[in-house]
A protein has these predicted regions:
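Generic structural detector for well-ordered beta-strands
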Residues: 22-26, 53, 69, 79, ...
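A conserved amphipathic terminal alpha-helix motif
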Residues: 2-3, 126-178
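Hydrophobic ligand-binding cavity/cleft-lining segments
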Residues: 1-56, 175-178
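Hydrophobic-ligand binding "helix-grip"
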Residues: 2-4, 43-44, 70-119, 125, ...
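Short, solvent-exposed loop/turn elements at beta->coil junctions and helix N-caps
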Residues: 54-58, 94-96
Length: 178
């Protein structure tokens, strides 16, 4: 296993390779958090993910771990360092089966809105391995586009949940930062 450095919430503002996305989801924070806990949902709305395996038993909490199989054969071993259902969660890579990054973390925040909707904030920060540091700035537009597609996939997935658990207002445009 290629070990990765743990990151903290402060690293999202410190690292150059950091992205922020915001959108409105047509479901309550509770329902969206259920989607995040459901390992079967991830490959549907995040096409780059082939499989999610929780390696810690429920109830999930800080310290919970999971393995995520990603297209291209990458397996990421993740540890959650924030777990506050239904409001926020964050994890960092403990390691990967391939030398992909030195460190990577993701932060998910769910803010309740009127009409049973949710403001979703997703932040991703990473440090490239030394040989990729010079190429990383050139890849930023492609990474941003790739991540925006994941957000759009989540919007579609949530919008198609059973009507009793979603709001009926139209989806909002994704805003990407970073």
């Amino acid at each position: 296993m290629n070990e990765c450095k743990p990151l903290t919430l402060e690293d999202f503002d410190r690292l150059n390779d950091s992205f922020r996305f915001e959108t409105t989801l047509e479901a309550t924070p509770e329902r969206v958090f259920e989607v995040f806990e459901d390992p079967e949902s991830w490959p549907i709305w995040a096409r780059a993910i082939k499989k999610v395996t929780w390696t810690s038993p429920k109830p999930f909490a800080v310290g919970t771990t999971r393995d995520v199989d990603i297209v291209g054969g990458l397996v990421a071993h993740e540890r959650f360092f924030v777990w506050e259902p239904p409001h926020r969660m964050a994890f960092y890579f403990v390691g990967t089966n391939k030398p992909a990054v030195t460190s990577l973390a993701e932060y998910y925040e769910l803010q309740p809105l009127s009409g049973g909707r949710t403001r979703f904030i997703w932040r991703v920060a990473y440090e490239s391995r030394s040989r990729m540091r010079y190429v990383s700035p050139l890849l930023r537009p492609a990474v941003r586009l790739f991540m925006a597609r994941i957000v759009k996939g989540l919007e579609r997935y949530v919008r198609e949940l059973p009507p009793a658990e979603t709001a009926s207002t139209p989806s909002r445009e994704v805003r990407a930062y970073g």
